[in-house]
Amino acid sequence: TRTTSSAASDVYKRQVPTNGKFGERVADICRQFCNVKHLNYEWGRSFDLYELEQQLERGCYEALLICHNETSTGITQDAEAIAEMCERHGVSFILDGITSVGGMPVHPAKWKAEAVVMGAQKCTAGPSGIAAIAVNEHCVERIKAIHQQGDANPRYYFDMISALKKGDDDQTPWTPAINLAMGWSAALDHLKDETNEARWARCETMAKGVRALFTDLGFALLADSGQRSNSVTAILYPQGIDDAWRTALKEKYDTQVIGAQDHLKGKMFRVGSMGETPVEEMIEGCRRMIACFRDFGVDLKDVDVASYFG
């Protein structure tokens, strides 16, 4: 919200393509502060990059925003291709990286992203309730220009100018949640010890293993095959199974997976592979999921679960 309210006004128009719940939330936030062209794709389907570029060719957009990793549907957008498209048309590229930063390659400088938003509680395995924004110099200058022109949105606590001024002194405009910041700092120390590259690889190993395992067992995956996420896998339930399975998985097997959002509730489940989850824990979790499906009468072949994660 701070990124959108500070760097836009009602004279601006932004393009927001979406293919899931959290992208739609980005579009809704943008509508509070500026004009929005919402390209609403089917959940789990890849963006039509040709359509996105056709829109940009109209020359009426100042920015394009995406939810980089859409965890509601288990799809990761082709951020690099979209970034190149934005550069060709002189449009700012803004990235919701809440569930991608720390869990997969994100390159703000290479992609010339104007702003990247991230949350602590996802791929960096920090506490919930704290977030960070990275902005480039162009974004800072544009925010200042909007303020000088008198077009700024009246959002006192979301004013980026105040944050930038205090940031020069390594301070915040108001008292921060110090305990959360310290918790996040500790989590980032763990990430530093592991290294970005090693964490990306571990998340990819787990996600690929989950995808291959459940596909071999006859399950269908929601997201398009070319862009499936390495931080979460969305798996459709077999016929006759619903969220009662998740309840049983939690109560009998002490294992939790998340359900679906909105119109997909009761039709699929999602397996996370982000943060500090070890591969061994994922293997055991998959064994328990398979056992629970068998409890519900689903006929599944015998498989060597660990072999999918080697």
Identify the meaning behind each predicted range:
Residues 47-102, 115:
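Active-site phosphate-binding strand-loop segment of PLP-dependent enzymes
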Residues 1-8, 12:
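Single conserved hydrophobic/aromatic residue that forms the stacking wall/gate
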Residues 10-24:
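Conserved PLP-anchoring active-site segment centered on the Schiff-base-forming lysine
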Residues 109-121:
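Conserved active-site segment immediately N-terminal to the catalytic lysine
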Residues 263, 267-310:
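PLP-dependent enzyme catalytic core of the Aspartate aminotransferase-like
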Residues 220-252:
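Conserved PLP-binding catalytic core of the aspartate aminotransferase-like
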